[in-house]
Amino acid sequence: MKHYSIQPANLEFNAEGTPVSRDFDDVYFSNDNGLEETRYVFLGGNHLEARFPEHPHPLFVVAESGFGTGLNFLTLWQAFDQFREAHPQAQLQRLHFISFEKFPLARADLVLAHQHWPELAPWAEQLQAQWPLPLSGCHRLLLDEGRVTLDLWFGDINELTSQLDDSLNQKVDAWFLDGFAPAKNPDMWTQNLFTAMARLARPGGTLATFTSAGFVRRGLQEAGFTMQKRKGFGRKREMLCGVMEQTLPLPCSTPWFNRTGSNKQEAAIIGGGIASALLSLALLRRGWQVTLYCADEAPALGASGNRQGALYPLLSKHDEALNRFFSNAFTFARRFYDLLPVKFDHDWCGVTQLGWDEKSQHKIAQMLSMDLPAELAVAVEANAVEQITGVATNCSGITYPQGGWLCPAELTRNVLELAQQQGLQIHYQYQLQDLSRKDDGWLLNFAGDQQATHSLVVLANGHQISRFSQTSSLPVYSVAGQVSHIPTTPELAKLKQVLCYDGYLTPQNPANQHHCIGASYHRGSEETAYSDEDQQQNRQRLIDCFPQVQWAKEVDVSGKEARCGVRCATRDHLPMVGNVPDYDATLVEYASLAEKKDEAVSAPVYDDLFMFAALGSRGLCSAPLCAEILAAQMSEEPIPMDASTLAALNPNRLWVRKLLKGKAVKAG
């Protein structure tokens, strides 16, 4: 699944003000009463009004083909809110809507289309505010304070459904089979789509569609649905409804990357940084009971404790998984931070990455060739850099207009405070020594003879993650680094954006009139003592990259103000998020994996033990989406990521890649 810009919908508005696709010569909704048609066909056809109060689970999942203007989603959301108001004690608490759209509307067209339905304005405005960039892949939108989740998959539905992770199999309670009419858009209405719908449908799941075409009914029956006709809406004579009355066999396509969750809803998190904080929120939103154990006397004393950190995506033309992950992680992070109800120092001032030498210029040229939306990344010539950044550099580069900087320490502290208000229990100065399986959970042994037992455990303790017997073989490494804090000058005060070169320089923080220059890099080190050599090195890298500008030479590090931290990283620059893999069992079970892929069992893991680690230097970008991915996995909910990209986050990936090629694997 190559990551690329998505072509927006090519539409016009007819005399009635209804959007019409020029490419498909079809309306997006009925000229007569599109809202009532949606209520009749999709809500009524799936019997949702009757099913909501009787639903035995806290989450109801709806999937849709063709998001269009979002009319179906907004109508359902309105109905769900009305249900929750009428049945506050019902088991069902949250709505999850998954939709596929090949040609998403431009935001301006979306806003115009929504003017048709003033009664939906409270819901439409929330959707408009979070409308994502036109990037292929999954965009998760958290709406109504997380009670409603919208997964927008941009791209061709027949391609996307073949690339979904197995976590979506048998999760859908109701299908809205929508889109332009089969005669107008035959490429969508395929047997592959019908088969995918059946695979994703939960036993007892339903479907409804406006069409009564015979080939659609027969195709859905062949896929496994029991179909029937129903009176159509308005002038349409008939429509189709269906139910999945059987449990279909579901072979796992890549068992070595299989992910497992739990229905226990109780977990301990080991850590005290941004990963722990954001995962706590994500689990609490799903109704979990969460306890956090932090080795330090306060949060954010490790790698998450910096004053300023840059937020921008890590892009690579030669690594599709890296590009897909960080593009979507970045856009999710911006939406997430904007809606987070806590205060933290930040400025979405933009980030400009500069080509200071031939190698970096070539890298930037390759990134710019990837057909990315201008809202995400755009080229900037040397003569324009000073205009957008405020300082001269004599370098061209790439700018991320939605990037910027934020204070990780303040973010972490305030998110944990919010989580405590929502029920999080926190224990400080609890240094985990070891953990072992006990009955149906985990026994945690802390320094000072303290013990605790929990159903599930998540290790999110940064570079210390490999200190346990279960994790000692993980291929992660520590990186010590020092960030220099420098006072502003008249020239530095002009800096309007974060500059990235062979290091980074932030605009001044109004809270302290200082800039941050970072960071030194010592692979394999866990040293956190101040280093004057590192301080001078941070300054010298800035001068070496911009030798012709005077302001760089005026940077003053003599005050010896700095912060030292240790990051956890991997050689492929991607986080490790998911089940903790069992190294010894993996080598035994997969000894012949290269020759016997068809006989492979599910990946050997430690039951109910998870990890959220190796965020490297891009944790501010990756942590929000990673927290959402892991919380969804642990809760056995749909995961907002395609299978191949999700595999690239699997903690066992580096071992499995070698085993698939018949190569030897070494610990660490």
From Swiss-Prot:
Keywords of the record: Cytoplasm, FAD, Flavoprotein, Methyltransferase, Multifunctional enzyme, Oxidoreductase, S-adenosyl-L-methionine, Transferase, tRNA processing
Gene expressing this chain: mnmC
Subcellular localization, as worded in the UniProt entry: Cytoplasm
Purpose of the protein: Catalyzes the last two steps in the biosynthesis of 5-methylaminomethyl-2-thiouridine (mnm(5)s(2)U) at the wobble position (U34) in tRNA. Catalyzes the FAD-dependent demodification of cmnm(5)s(2)U34 to nm(5)s(2)U34, followed by the transfer of a methyl group from S-adenosyl-L-methionine to nm(5)s(2)U34, to form mnm(5)s(2)U34.
InterPro entries on file: FAD-dep_OxRdtase, FAD/NAD-bd_sf, MnmC-like_methylTransf, SAM-dependent_MTases_sf, tRNA_MAMT_biosynth_bifunc_MnmC, tRNA_MNMC2, tRNA_S-uridine_synth_MnmC_C
Pfam families linked to this entry: DAO, Methyltransf_30
This protein's name: tRNA 5-methylaminomethyl-2-thiouridine biosynthesis bifunctional protein MnmC
Region annotation tRNA (mnm(5)s(2)U34)-methyltransferase: where it falls in the sequence: 1-245
GO molecular function, one term: oxidoreductase activity, acting on the CH-NH group of donors
Source lineage: Bacteria, Pseudomonadati, Pseudomonadota, Gammaproteobacteria, Enterobacterales
